[in-house]
Swiss-Prot record:
Mode of membrane association: Single-pass membrane protein
GO biological process: photosynthesis
Name used for this protein in its record: Photosystem I reaction center subunit IX
Keyword tags: Chloroplast, Membrane, Photosynthesis, Photosystem I, Plastid, Thylakoid, Transmembrane, Transmembrane helix
Function summary: May help in the organization of the PsaE and PsaF subunits.
GO CC annotation: chloroplast thylakoid membrane; photosystem I
Covalent S-S links between cysteines: none
Main subcellular location: plastid
Assigned protein family: Belongs to the PsaJ family.
Keyword check for Cell membrane: no
InterPro entries linked: PSI_PsaJ (IPR002615), PSI_PsaJ_sf (IPR036062)
Keyword Cytoplasm assigned: no
Subcellular location: Plastid, Chloroplast thylakoid membrane
């Protein structure tokens, strides 16, 4: 792999987008399996 590509992947906007996509997909899947839970008490 190119070092510039790895440096690009480690920048804040890319990490922020990946993290938001992961969080959104987790919430969507949890909402699919537990549709009546409006919040998740941890």
């Amino acid at each position: 792999m190119d070092s510039n590509f790895l440096k690009y992947l480690s920048t804040a906007p890319v990490l922020f987008t990946v993290w938001l996509s992961f969080t959104a997909s987790f919430i969507i899947e949890a909402n699919r399996f537990f549709p009546d839970m409006l919040y998740f008490p941890m």
